[in-house]
Amino acid sequence: MRRTLPLMLALVVAILVMVIVNVFIGSVKIPVGDICRILVGQGSESEIWTNIILSSRLPQVLTAIVAGAGLAVSGLMMQTIFHNPLAGPSILGISNGASLGVAFVVLLSGQLGGVALSSLGYLGDAAVSVAAIVGAIAVMMLIVWISGKVKGNVTLLIIGVMIGYLATAIIGVLKFLSPEEDVKAFVVWGLGSFSRVSGDQMILFVVLMCILLPLSFLLVKPLNAMLLGDRYAANLGVNVKRARTWIIVCSGTLVAIVTAYCGPIMFIGMAVPHLARGIFRTSDHWKLMPATALCGALLALICNLIARAPGFEGAMPVNSVTALIGAPIIIYVLYRRRKTSYE
């Protein structure tokens, strides 16, 4: 505890600093004085600057914090129940299910309805979000049903990976059969972005995530028991099958919602739990769960800042930035702690 609390406070301070930096720095240069006046409600000489701060940068900051924390916690739960350091939000095919749902809507809308989703504005965005949630939840329910039929985690893991490959194959066929404009729209969605959540959608997104994240913390006890294996957890009185089902449901729902609003951003979920373990040097989920959430939020803010770095028109793909920034950090952490229980 003597080491944990200062580290937690340091992460909170780092997040606050990154929030400020994300608001003040972006691809469009805005004077600091104008930003301060906008934030305190006094407005600015330029309506465009006001719109950039209030409708773009602030929503992106909040989205990055919530999405980063959700993906990181989801990845931590997956790695624990499968005892696999490479497990992440996409390991059971749930992210692929979300992508498949979006593919059906985006790639087939023009052919079946004669209207491209890109021309529908808010309704098109809502259709994409709903399709992603439906696709992810459909795969998650299939995984939950299968988990009640099989005993071993390895079997469930392999089945989940195969479902992911199947979804990817179907997406490939749909892309081959679809016009170039629809394929381009789907590819852009697949790059991931924290800028897609509008003010109207933000309330629902944040409320859902603020419900799911505390629910994840209620699963800390069975997660700690499952660290040493399902048999050990059962000896401690944990209903392993029920706990595994709830963990999959909670983790899968987190992924479904984030993917629906931000696109598939998988790397944070796989990498951040290792980063948190390396920093806090613990496997106790009472400490590791909040640490992972904070690290996920911080990394997402850093990646969002780099994606909108000054000197670039528009924003770089968040998925590319997360991999470029996170992979070297995780390789270093794993190398320094190469005698962990995973090896």
Regions found by a protein language model. Name each.
Residues M1-E343:
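Alpha-helical transmembrane segments in inner-membrane proteins
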